[in-house]
Amino acid sequence: AKLLVEYFQKQGYDLTQLQGSVNYDPMGKMMAKGKDLSNFAATAKELVDVLAPLPKYRCICVNAVELNNAGSYISQELGYALAWGNEYLNKLIEAGVPATSAAKRIKFNFGISSNYFLEIAKFRAGRMLWANIVNEYKPECECACKMIAHAETSTFNLTLFDAHVNLLRTQTETMSAALAGVNSITVTPFDKTYKTPDDFSERIARNQQLLLKEECHFNKVVDPAAGSYFIENLTVSIAKQAWDLFLNVEEEGGMLEAVKAGKVQEAVNASNKARHDAVSKRKEVLLGTNQFPNFNEKAGEKNPVEAQCCCSGNSCEKPIATLNFNRAASEFETLRLQTERSGKRPKAFMLTIGNLAMRQARAQFSCNFLACAGYEVIDNLGFPTVEEGVEAAMKAGADIVVICSSDDEYAEYAVPAFKALNGR
């Protein structure tokens, strides 16, 4: 930070007008890496003092995007972020920093999920609740109550297969954050799940938000969602849930104590598990992964890039529990990669017969279901008899034959199909 100030001075910049942040976040590192960094108050105050010549620079960061990337629910992310920010505010004030100065040095970094309207409501609720919290410290200037929020598209819902769908995810996420009035946005490159983003994917990521700014003019409006009953109602609902969580954390000793005890990590990891279960049952849809996969896509040399701990994947003792950053698609991707690299891709043949509407519906479901595991699927228009369907399956070299028909007709076709296959 000191070098930064010296550099700006040498360049002759007007220090009072420069905006940016240093993003010191010890509690975030505690949850991500498992290191005990609880004695951070002195360092935080020193940062504030060093950056005194830069009044518009933020140096303390509430990096709540880590919770989002770990699969937290929206109310959890916001509730813990408020407690997180309040902990930093308390520590700075206890270290002798005035409330106004302390609040003006804190920045929030939120994640953006694919829940479009809920994300708009989250940011609106966050600004309101943070203003209420800071106001309780009686700052000299009301401007200290303003939340500075950066938004970053989530990595939890990004996928390795059909990776270009990630562009659609991040675009709608960016749109929701822009409509919510965040101060700045980072769009995650679509290929981050399987490699270090290159010049192309980074340029596309930049252009995604430039489209919203320069062509849609989203930077020219202030709170366009105001007055919408649906979003206002969501804002109140999320604010209530987040506030209840904030109060619960404060009653138990504050965010630092909750992190040291592993309570925050335990709650977020439980949400991660619940969301993985929802994805496995298709209650939460990931297009191209657990629903409507690209039948012909192969991963090739792609391998998922997963977050590693401070020990670079080696086992180690951690004094503090850590967050689980496994993406929602990770289990499906593991299954599909194992299938693809097993040496033989199972071939599933759809024996469509009988009622036209039902056989098409059953074939579509079966193709999607099996392709999610990386199986090669062969769909068909229909067969007049079971025997013809079985012969076609044998000629195609099928490993699996799926009878696709109506419930009433299954009893009629199942026995002849079993006899025609006869262990073949």
What are the roles of these predicted feature ranges?
Residues 85, 109-197, 201-205:
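Glycine-rich anion/phosphate-binding loop at the beta-strand->alpha-helix junction
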Residues 23-27, 62-69, 104-113, 144-156, ...:
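A glycine-rich phosphate-binding loop feature that marks nucleotide/adenosyl-phosphate handling sites
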Residues 333-374:
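C-terminal accessory/binding modules appended to enzymatic or scaffolding proteins
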Residues 1-115, 137-140, 146-150, 178, ...:
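Catalytic alpha/beta active-site cores
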Residues 183, 219, 244-346:
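Intrinsic disorder at enzyme termini
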Residues 72-78, 113-125, 154-167, 195-205, ...:
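Short glycine/threonine-rich loop-to-helix capping motif typified by GTGT followed
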Residues 47, 52-91, 168-246, 252:
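Mobile "lid/hinge" segments at catalytic clefts and subdomain interfaces of large enzymes
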